[in-house]
Amino acid sequence: MEILVIGSGGREHALCWALSGSPLCDTLYCAPGNAGVSAVAECVDVGAEDLDGLMVFVAAKKIDFVVVGPEGPLVLGLIDRLNEAGVKCFGPTAAAAQLEGSKSFTKELCAKYDIPTGAYKRFSDVAEATAYINEKGAPIVVKADGLAAGKGVTVAKSIEEAVAAVDDALVSGRFGDAGASIIVEEFLAGEELSVFAICDGENALMLPSAQDHKAVFDGDKGPNTGGMGAYSPAPVMTGVLAATIEEKIVRRTVAAMKAEGTPFTGVLFAGLMITDNGPQLIEFNVRFGDPECQVLMMRLKSDLLSALVAAADQELKDFDLRWDDQTALTVVLAANGYPESYDKGTEICNVDEADAMFNTKVFHAGTARGKTGALQAIGGRVLNITALGESVTDAQKRAYEAVDAVEWADGFCRRDIGWRAVAREQG
């Protein structure tokens, strides 16, 4: 098969790495890809959201199967375009992608189909939102309704912080159209968990759990990011909890989407809070998490391509995947200043040495080759140093040994990825 992966991040490098080993894969392309992806796929100079350019490339290369990594092209309707052209693809239609593209759509679906989530209200008026926040008190959560690259959520510890987040979205227009309306939601206390399922419109194939770290600094301090690290499996996940999540959240959502006439095909990513009242949905995403995808691909022992094709063909019912019992942990190396402004074009050395370390893989995100062939940072999140270990403690130790092998004066990382699980393991 001629395969095209859409995207340029660490998630897409991990997907390309996994897909490249499939016996079904003859040629693998990635649009636009990055410096790391180029080792396993042919990178194509077409942007992930350039739908016209992508359709031209698909036709020219007679692509058999398209895998869409990021949410942007999904919400814009790339899958709809591919379906119209008769090209097999993996991902939800624009209508189904509203699960991520509109938080109010998801909240209304949860209310209608009894999917457990926090109480909320939607606002586009500053005064009304402020009055609601004053009535409810803090802590409270303020979210941009649309896509904001993982940065549109404020967990406000004070009323003042919540009101400032409202002003950011509705007055300052920080998130553009994505923040033209907001969701104000009850604060859920507990432990966060990421759960993934590959869906074919009717069936859901559950994948292992993962836990990510959104805050930029150690100790979960600082603003939220797209994710600074992750590990899988998450020790908080028990057999009983997994069954509850599958029944009350994942399968209930898949059935709800089918009933609404917008069947969901693709990766359903449930961001959950495990509370004293059981699992509660924080948000849905309609694609693999980044960096959670990297730890999942590190543990996958089966053929990913076969599973994605089965989902596209609505044939997931009896499908299964095998996973390594070891723990995978990834540490994100980011450019100094991220998630705010940061320098581009800084040089990174010794990445190949880190990649060659035992049970370690370096997935590239914001990287490119300079004119001399040197590896350069061109994004905020730049490298994902990923390792396997017998425990979270072991995987963490191995990952940070590889992190320390990389020479990049202009980058930083969190030094505590996996801290909850390590604390559990060490009693």
Give each language-model segment a name.
Residues 50, 367-372, 376-427:
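Generic C-terminus detector
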